[in-house]
Swiss-Prot record:
Its EC number is 2.1.1.182. Specifically dimethylates two adjacent adenosines (A1518 and A1519) in the loop of a conserved hairpin near the 3'-end of 16S rRNA in the 30S particle. May play a critical role in biogenesis of 30S subunits. It catalyses: adenosine(1518)/adenosine(1519) in 16S rRNA + 4 S-adenosyl-L-methionine = N(6)-dimethyladenosine(1518)/N(6)-dimethyladenosine(1519) in 16S rRNA + 4 S-adenosyl-L-homocysteine + 4 H(+). It comes from Hydrogenovibrio crunogenus (strain DSM 25203 / XCL-2). This is Ribosomal RNA small subunit methyltransferase A. It is found in: Cytoplasm. InterPro entries: KsgA/Erm (IPR001737), rRNA_Ade_diMease-like_C (IPR023165), rRNA_Ade_methylase_Trfase_N (IPR020598), rRNA_adenine_dimethylase (IPR011530), SAM-dependent_MTases_sf (IPR029063). GO terms for cellular component: cytosol. HAMAP family: 16SrRNA_methyltr_A. Coiled coil: none annotated. Belongs to the class I-like SAM-binding methyltransferase superfamily. rRNA adenine N(6)-methyltransferase family. RsmA subfamily. It holds the Pfam family RrnaAD. The gene is rsmA. Keywords: Cytoplasm, Methyltransferase, RNA-binding, rRNA processing, S-adenosyl-L-methionine, Transferase.
């Protein structure tokens, strides 16, 4: 592809190390009959290797200047399907080829760091259609996604993603592997939506609302942050000390809190 002028507003940092690219493809382990979706292909570091393997690759790209080069390079390949759109607004359910009960989409991407959290929350809405996701993200974000209770990195993002997905930290990638090099380390994470969640909230919207409120002021206790949601007695009924901070509360306890809040509200 012709040299591209990287755009800061799209958070563009493109992979340039073939060894890392091969490691990512090996981690994804795509099979010929699978349906992959790539978000933000950039200069097609992953696109080419994936198209060599899979029967269908949907590409989501927002940058006008990349549409022409991508089309020119890959449009001859029947597996290549380009969507010139914003990944944050895209309806991923429209990619399904038929009504199916089996999650079929495998989503990959070197996600723009400036929109990674909102994009992950958007993708969680489509978890029932997704087999797995492999993303390059800012290392700090991957640490937050995979963090366990009691660790500083554990927060709202940890809870919301771990409620829906198994998470796995795969690989750290240094700035020197990108053009232009970012100011921070990156990492690759695997997210695999649960076929059946180990802990199920009665109402997912109430769960999301309560988790957001619990982490609204990280240095404050559950008692303070959940004022107006639950009282001390209700928090204790979930096996929790009202004086603990949200960062010490496991996902399953947030489900209990959410279910109690939902019933009390009703």
């Amino acid at each position: 592809m012709a040299k591209h002028q990287h755009k800061k507003r799209f958070g563009q940092n493109f992979l340039n190390n073939d060894r890392i690219i091969q490691q990512i493809v090996a981690a994804i382990a795509p099979k010929p009959d699978q349906h992959l979706v790539e978000i933000g292909p950039g200069e097609a570091a992953l696109t080419g290797p994936l198209l060599d393997i899979v029967k269908k690759l949907d590409i989501i790209e927002i940058d006008n200047d990349l549409i022409g080069p991508l089309t020119k390079r890959f449009s001859h390949n029947p597996a290549f399907h380009l969507h010139h759109t914003d990944a944050l607004l895209f309806d991923y359910s429209q990619l399904l080829e038929a009504e199916t009960e089996t999650p079929s989409l495998r989503i990959v991407g070197n996600l723009p760091y400036n929109i990674s959290s909102p994009l992950l929350f958007h993708l969680l809405k489509y978890a029932r259609y997704i087999q797995d996701m492999h993303f390059m993200l800012q290392k700090e974000v991957v640490e937050r996604i995979t963090a366990q209770p009691g660790v500083k990195a554990y927060g709202r993002l940890s809870v919301m993603i771990q409620y829906t997905c198994e998470t796995e930290y795969l690989l750290t990638v240094g700035p020197e592997n990108f053009t232009p090099p970012p100011k921070v380390d990156s990492a690759i994470v695997r997210l695999r939506p649960f076929e059946k969640r180990p802990f199920q909230a009665i109402d997912d919207k109430d769960f999301a609302k309560l988790v957001k409120q619990a982490f609204s002021q990280k240095r404050k206790t559950l008692r303070n942050n959940l004022k107006g949601f639950l009282n001390d007695e209700q928090i204790e009924a979930c096996g929790l000390d009202p004086s603990v901070r949200a960062e010490k509360v496991p996902v399953e306890a947030f489900v209990l809190l959410s279910n109690l809040y939902h019933k009390d509200k009703a």
